[in-house]
UniProtKB/Swiss-Prot annotation:
<keyword id="KW-0963">Cytoplasm</keyword>
<dbReference type="InterPro" id="IPR046885">
    <property type="entry name" value="MnmA-like_C"/>
</dbReference>
<keyword id="KW-1015">Disulfide bond</keyword>
<comment type="function">
    <text>Catalyzes the 2-thiolation of uridine at the wobble position (U34) of tRNA, leading to the formation of s(2)U34.</text>
</comment>
<keyword id="KW-0547">Nucleotide-binding</keyword>
<keyword id="KW-0067">ATP-binding</keyword>
<dbReference type="Pfam" id="PF03054">
    <property type="entry name" value="tRNA_Me_trans"/>
</dbReference>
<dbReference type="InterPro" id="IPR023382">
    <property type="entry name" value="MnmA-like_central_sf"/>
</dbReference>
<dbReference type="GO" id="GO:0002143">
    <property type="term" value="P:tRNA wobble position uridine thiolation"/>
</dbReference>
<feature type="site" description="Interaction with tRNA">
    <location>
        <position position="128"/>
    </location>
</feature>
<dbReference type="Pfam" id="PF20259">
    <property type="entry name" value="tRNA_Me_trans_M"/>
</dbReference>
<feature type="disulfide bond" description="Alternate">
    <location>
        <begin position="103"/>
        <end position="200"/>
    </location>
</feature>
<dbReference type="InterPro" id="IPR004506">
    <property type="entry name" value="MnmA-like"/>
</dbReference>
<feature type="active site" description="Nucleophile">
    <location>
        <position position="103"/>
    </location>
</feature>
<protein>
    <recommendedName>
        <fullName>tRNA-specific 2-thiouridylase MnmA</fullName>
        <ecNumber>2.8.1.13</ecNumber>
    </recommendedName>
</protein>
<feature type="site" description="Interaction with tRNA">
    <location>
        <position position="344"/>
    </location>
</feature>
<keyword id="KW-0808">Transferase</keyword>
Length: 373
C-alpha cells in the first residue's frame, strides 16, 4: 500500500471552489499538499478591479482551513509573452483564438509545473474536470471528466505525455454539484463562490473595451455575399464566424425575417460578410486544415485515422477522418459542419479518451476555402 504522505502534490489554487476541493481531497487522501496561487495578470488594471487580491485571500482562507502551506507566484511576464501576445496576434490575423488552450499548455502545465518542481513536487494537481489513467506500459491516457457538462479535456488537448505523467485531476470522477457539496460540508470559504468566466486569467472584462486598448479597431463595410452593403462594422476583431448578436441590422433589410449572422471576413479589404439564416450556405463546410497538431501520447509522424472531434467547447462530438502530416492535418467531416472558426481548437476523441488536437487554419466546402479570413 502506497504511503501518500511521502508523495508531494503542488496544487494550482485560483481561489475558486474547484481548486479548493482539489486541495482538500488530496489532503484527505494523505498526500503532502502545497497550494500555489498563480498571479498572471496585473490586477491594478484599467478598471481598478483587484480580483487577484480577493482571490488570494480566498486561497489563504481555504489553505488555513485544511492545514496546508501556500505560496503566491508571479507569472505575469510568462503569460504576456506566451499567451497574451499569441492572443493579440491571432486577432490581428482575423482569427478567433482560444487563449485557454494556450494558457494550459504554457502556464498551468509548463511555468507552474516547472515552479512546482522547485518545491520538490512529485505531481501537480488542478481543479480541471478531466481524468488520467495509466496503462500497463506506464502511458498516461487523458479521459473526459465524468460530468459531461463540465468536461474540460477540450482545453487540455495540447498537453504532452510528459506533462500528463506529472499531473493529477482529483475532480475528474465527480459531478460539479458534488464538488460544491464537499466544499460546503468542509466549511470552505469558496463553497458558494460563483464560477469564473471570461478570458483565461483575465476574467470578466468588457471584451470590446478590453481588446481596443491593445488593438486599434478599424471600422469597415458590412456586406452580403452577393455584394449588398449592409452598413458599417466596428472592427473585424470584434466578430466571430457564426455570431448573431451585435450586428445592428435586425430584420430591416428585405422581406426575409430570419436573423443575420456573421458568415465571413475579408481581412485585406476589411469587409465583414453577413447572411440570413442559422444554416446559411456560407457557414457550412465539410473539411478543415489544422496546424499545431499535437497528441497526448506517441503517434506516428504520418497516419490516417477515424475518430470523433469537437470544433468548439461543449458541442456534441462529430465523426471525422483525420489525415496527419507532421504537425498539420486535414480533417474531413462525415456530415457538414456549421461555423468552423479559424483560431479555435479542433480536438480528437476515441470514446472517452482525448487524443489531442490542433488549431483550425481554414474551413473548406467541396475543396474550396470558405471566405472566413
Amino acid at each position: 500500500m502506497t504511503d501518500n504522505s511521502k508523495i508531494r502534490v503542488v496544487v494550482g489554487m485560483s481561489g475558486g471552489v474547484d481548486s479548493s476541493v482539489t486541495a482538500l481531497l488530496l489532503k484527505e487522501q494523505g498526500y503532502d499538499v502545497i497550494g500555489v496561487f498563480m498571479k498572471n495578470w496585473d490586477d491594478t488594471d484599467e478598471f481598478g478591479v483587484c480580483t487577484a487580491t480577493e482571490d488570494y485571500k480566498d486561497v489563504a482562507a481555504v489553505a488555513d482551513k485544511i492545514g496546508i502551506p501556500y505560496y503566491s507566484v508571479n507569472f505575469e511576464k510568462e503569460y504576456w509573452d506566451r499567451v497574451f501576445e499569441y492572443f493579440l496576434a491571432e486577432y490581428r490575423a482575423g482569427r478567433t483564438p482560444n487563449p485557454d488552450v494556450m494558457c494550459n499548455k504554457e502556464i498551468k502545465f509548463k511555468a507552474f509545473l516547472d515552479y512546482a518542481m522547485t518545491l520538490g513536487a512529485d505531481y501537480v494537481a488542478t481543479g480541471h474536470y478531466a481524468q488520467v489513467k495509466r496503462d500497463e506500459n506506464g502511458t498516461v491516457h487523458m479521459l473526459r471528466g465524468a460530468d459531461n457538462g463540465k468536461d474540460q479535456t477540450y482545453f487540455l488537448s495540447q498537453l504532452s505525455q510528459e506533462q500528463l505523467q506529472k499531473t493529477l485531476f482529483p475532480l475528474g470522477h465527480l459531478q460539479k454539484s458534488e464538488v460544491r457539496e464537499i466544499a460546503e460540508r468542509a466549511g470552505l470559504a469558496t463553497a458558494k463562490k460563483k464560477d469564473s468566466t471570461g478570458i483565461c486569467f483575465i476574467g470578466e472584462k468588457n471584451f470590446k473595451q478590453f481588446l481596443s486598448q491593445y488593438l486599434p479597431a478599424q471600422k469597415g463595410r458590412m456586406m452580403t455575399i452577393d455584394g449588398r452593403d449592409m452598413g458599417e462594422h466596428a472592427g473585424l476583431m470584434y466578430y466571430t464566424i457564426g455570431q448573431r448578436g451585435g450586428l445592428g441590422i435586425g430584420g430591416q433589410h428585405g422581406g426575409d425575417n430570419q436573423p443575420w449572422f456573421v458568415v465571413g471576413k475579408d481581412l485585406s479589404q476589411n469587409i465583414l460578410y453577413v447572411g440570413q439564416g442559422f444554416y446559411h450556405e456560407a457557414l457550412m463546410s465539410n473539411s478543415l486544415d489544422a496546424s499545431v497538431i499535437h497528441f497526448t501520447r506517441e503517434m506516428p509522424e504520418e497516419f490516417t485515422f477515424e475518430c470523433t472531434a469537437k470544433f468548439r467547447y461543449r458541442q456534441p462530438d462529430s465523426h471525422v477522418a483525420v489525415h496527419v502530416r507532421g504537425d498539420k492535418a486535414e480533417v474531413v467531416f462525415a456530415e457538414p459542419q456549421r461555423a468552423i472558426t479559424p483560431g479555435q481548437a479542433v480536438v480528437f476523441y476515441d470514446g472517452k479518451e482525448c487524443l489531442g488536437g490542433g488549431m483550425i487554419d481554414m474551413a473548406y466546402k467541396n475543396g474550396q476555402p470558405c471566405q472566413y479570413i
